[in-house]
Design a protein with these regions (language model features):
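Active-site histidine-anchored catalytic micro-motif
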Residues: 78, 83, 91-100, 104-156
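Glycine-rich, highly charged phosphate/nucleotide-binding loops
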Residues: 61-70
Length: 216
C-alpha cells in the first residue's frame, strides 16, 4: 500500500494520523535562541505567553533534510512507494527539502511530492483524502491525479482575532495594526493560488460566520 506522509503544517490530530496511518515530517519553530520541532508536544499557550512577554513572534523554518530522510527511510527500505505533501511552495521551502531528501535516499522514482498550494486544514483535507485512496488500493499515479483535481477546489480561510501577531510577523504595518485594534477589526485571511491574502474585514465581536466559497 502507498504510504502517505505530510509535513506538520497539515495540523491533523494524533487521532486522525493514527486512524489513517499518516506520518509527519515536522517543521521547526524558532523561539529566540531555541529551536523546537513542530508537533503535539508544543505548548501553544506557552508560545503565546513567550510572544507577548518578548513582543515578538516565533518563526518557522523548513524541516531538515535529515529529518525528512529519517521519516521516509523505513518505507523506502520496505520497498514501498510514498506520496508526501508539503505546505504551499509560496510559503515555505519545505517542498524542496522533501525532494532533496528523496534524492539523498536515491528514491526519486519511489516518492511523489505534492505541493498542496495550501496550509493547515487545506492540506489536511487533501492528506486524508489521499490516505483513503491509498487504503482503497489506488496506485500512486491514481492518487496524484485525484489530488491534483482537488487542489484548486480546496481553499482554507480563517479570521484573525487580533492584528498584533500579524504586525509582529511583518504581515501588516503598525498603522494598520493600530487602526485595526481601535476599530476592533478582524481580517479574514484566505489562501488563494498558494498565497495568503486578506479577503475581507469583520468588525466587533465575531461569534460566527460562514461565508460561501464565492464570497471568500
Amino acid at each position: 500500500m502507498i504510504k502517505i506522509i505530510s509535513d506538520s503544517t497539515c495540523d491533523l490530530s494524533q487521532e486522525v494520523l493514527e486512524r489513517y496511518d499518516i506520518d509527519i515530517i515536522p517543521l521547526h519553530i524558532v523561539k529566540g535562541d531555541e529551536e523546537l520541532e513542530d508537533g503535539p508536544q508544543i505548548d501553544i499557550h506557552a508560545l503565546y505567553e513567550w510572544a507577548d512577554k518578548n513582543k515578538t513572534t516565533p518563526k518557522t523554518s523548513a524541516p531538515s533534510i535529515e529529518t525528512a530522510m529519517n521519516v521516509m527511510r523505513p518505507y523506502i527500505d520496505e520497498g514501498r512507494e510514498i506520496i508526501c505533501f508539503s505546505i504551499s511552495s509560496e510559503m515555505s521551502t519545505s517542498i524542496n527539502v522533501i525532494r532533496m531528501a528523496a534524492e539523498e535516499l536515491d528514491a526519486v522514482d519511489k516518492v511523489t511530492v505534492i505541493d498542496s498550494r495550501n496550509l493547515s486544514t487545506g492540506i489536511g483535507l487533501l492528506v486524508v483524502e489521499a490516505a483513503v485512496m491509498a487504503a482503497d488500493g489506488k496506485s500512486r499515479e491514481e492518487i496524484k491525479a485525484g489530488i491534483d483535481e482537488l487542489i484548486p477546489k480546496v481553499r482554507a480561510s480563517f479570521v484573525v482575532d487580533t492584528l498584533v501577531y500579524l504586525y509582529r510577523g511583518g504581515r501588516c504595518n503598525a498603522v494598520s495594526a493600530l487602526i485595526g485594534g481601535a476599530l476592533a477589526l478582524h481580517p479574514m485571511i484566505v489562501v488563494k493560488d498558494g498565497k495568503m491574502d486578506a479577503s475581507r474585514k469583520y468588525r466587533g465581536c465575531l461569534l460566527y460566520t460562514s461565508p460561501s466559497p464565492r464570497d471568500a
